[in-house]
Amino acid sequence: PGYDAMFSAAAETNQAISCLVNADGLPEIDRMCSVHPNVTVVIDHLGRIGIDGVIRDSDVDMLCSLAKHEKVHVKGSAFYALGKDKPGHSDLVPLIRRVYDAYGPDRLMWASDAPPSLAVETYEDQISLIRDRISFLSEMDRDKIMRDTAARVVFFQ
């Protein structure tokens, strides 16, 4: 009942809900989005897929399946805590590609997760994966992911 009240309030007040959940919480997000299709939802930190060091296809499948809900967005952030958690984060590129293919750049946004992230890596480590090193992203995609999507979704521009 608590989630239903939260989603109902978000629908009534035109607020976005930002969800910090692990992959096992994604089915509940799916259920709530089915009941409340007009609520804007942002899944933080790629659904924390790989938080234990393992990126499971079933978790990625579940995150990608949420793209059927037009108002669901995904934040690519906390790279330092996902997968092999090494700066460079190249092990996350296949995950990011699948999420990109499911959602497109208009429903993806980057975030640093600072200040916690700054305890383990530099800001450059955090930003460079999306900004510089993912070859399938166009400049327009990067602009959307790095700036435009968040501006539109979070600030309702």
Predicted regions and their residues:
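Catalytic pocket-lining loop regions of alpha/beta-barrel enzymes
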Residues: P1-M109
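Short, active-site-adjacent cap segments at secondary-structure transitions
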Residues: A81, P116-L118
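Active-site glycine-centered loops adjacent to acidic/histidine catalytic or metal-binding residues
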Residues: D113
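Mid-to-C-terminal alpha-helical segments outside catalytic/metal-binding sites
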Residues: R98, A102-M109, L118-Q157
